Design a protein with these regions (language model features):
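Bacterial signal peptide processing site
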Residues: 25-27
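Ser/Thr/Gly/Pro-rich low-complexity, disordered linker/stalk segments of secreted
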Residues: 31-100
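C-terminal motif of bacterial Sec signal peptides marking the signal peptidase cleavage site
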Residues: 20-23
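Secretory/extracellular carbohydrate-interaction modules
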Residues: 110-225, 386-390
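Short, aromatic/His-centered strand-loop micro-motif at the edge of beta-sheets
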Residues: 232-252
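Activation corresponds to long, low-complexity, non-globular regions
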Residues: 102-136, 145-152, 310-390
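Flexible glycan-contacting loops in extracellular carbohydrate-active proteins
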Residues: 289-315
Length: 390
């Protein structure tokens, strides 16, 4: 894990997927120092290097829970040799995992035959990172890669709950559409081949003592203009931002979510960044004002691999996740997350096919296809459980 952690901080639409929300599971984690080279145009104010002191209330000692993560000794960030110059991402793609050693790969004919009559989606695999439920954190990072990346794929890297205790002190009840899920973020390959990032926040419903309900919807503050529809519905209501980002199969990236304070409203802002290990470039993708101050992430966060287009469900898709970590809001220490509860979601009639998932010394991994019969609960596919890396 320490060797991987040296890589963790070298930096500081045809079709939209409204995915099934995974059911909740449980987390631990990096270093107490890092070189913050993400220069935020939203949060920086007058400073070139933004102060990311968390915009959250610090609880009393009695309210603070003991963090079960393993605190790692600080290690200085190192420059990646691959990041010294851009690479030709077609000719120089690195070798990937030997997927055929863990999965019965369907032939092209089998895939085509299945997709000609498919009305189902391929299996849907989730991993809930082992962050204690009462842990509050202001930043979250995770590395990801998809060796096999057909259209109709969503690699979700974060599916989280927000700590709305500030609002809970003012209202009788505060809820989102899905218990324990306030937002998610990740990367997609759309039906026309366009590659994008996405970040979504569900509406927050606040009920006061006389029964009046106030709805708080996150407001996009970056980018200023987007071609995609801001609002969503179908699986609850809220706001999302979809940004073109040409992420490529077979390459490692890092997604970084960070909370800060809006200079204009005083509310919490959440930014979504991506770092490309091959080119050494970091990019601010989008940012949302959450409509309330003193908000941060809380408890478990999930990653999942989804096929959201039935006509492409036979294709083989993969995802690998490594070095997930969070910045604890109370201790201001980074913690590395070494385990996740991984399992398949759903079942017939919506999902069918074959799948496998697991973990090794470096990362969590998952692979799916609509071809085959290892669907959820018939006992022939990989059974869910706790998997560890490092």
């Amino acid at each position: 894990m320490k060797q991987l952690w040296k890589r963790l901080f070298p930096i500081g639409l045809a079709t939209l997927s409204l995915c099934m929300i995974p059911s909740c599971g449980n987390q631990s984690t990096p270093t107490n120092e890092r070189d913050n080279t993400f220069e935020s145009p939203i949060l920086s104010g007058e400073s070139d290097t933004p102060d990311i002191t968390p915009d959250v209330d610090t609880p009393s000692q009695a309210e603070s829970a003991t963090n079960s993560g393993d605190l790692l000794a600080p290690e200085p960030p190192v420059e990646s040799s691959e990041a010294s110059a851009p690479v030709d991402q077609d000719e120089d793609r690195p070798d990937g995992r030997n997927w055929s050693s863990v999965f019965a790969m369907p032939t092209a004919d089998e895939i085509n035959a299945y997709q000609n009559q498919s009305t189902h989606r391929a299996p849907y695999i989730t991993g809930w990172l082992s962050i204690p439920g009462d842990t509050r954190y202001t930043e979250y990072v995770v590395d990801f890669k998809a060796d096999l990346l057909p259209d109709g794929t969503y690699c979700c890297l974060g599916n989280w709950q927000m700590d709305y205790s500030y609002l809970e002190r003012q209202y009788t009840s505060v809820r989102t559409e899905y218990s324990g899920v306030s937002g998610y973020a990740g990367f997609q390959s759309l039906g026309d081949g366009t590659r994008v990032s996405i970040m979504s926040f569900w509406d927050v419903y606040c009920t006061d003592a006389d029964g009046s309900v106030t709805t708080i919807r996150a407001q996009r503050v970056y980018p200023e203009v987007t071609d995609q529809t801001e609002d969503f519905s179908g699986e609850g209501t809220g706001a999302h931002c979809i940004v073109p980002y040409n992420w490529k199969a077979g390459y490692w990236y890092q997604m970084h979510l960070k909370c800060g304070v809006s200079q204009s409203t005083g509310n919490t802002i959440v930014e979504q960044w991506v770092y490309d290990y091959a080119t050494g470039e970091s990019t601010l993708l989008c940012a949302y004002d959450l409509g309330a101050p003193n908000v941060c992430f809380k408890g478990a966060s999930a990653f999942f691999l989804e096929n959201f287009l039935e006509p492409l469900s036979g294709e083989v898709r993969t995802m690998e996740v490594r070095t997930p970590a969070y910045l604890d809001a109370d201790t201001q220490e980074w913690y590395a997350i070494a385990s996740a509860e991984m399992h398949s979601e759903g079942g017939l009639p919506q999902y069918e096919g074959s799948y496998n998932f697991g973990a090794d010394s470096e990362c969590f991994w998952m692979i799916t296809s609509g071809v085959g019969g290892d669907w959820y609960g018939n006992g022939t596919g990989q059974q869910g459980g706790t998997f560890s890396i490092g």
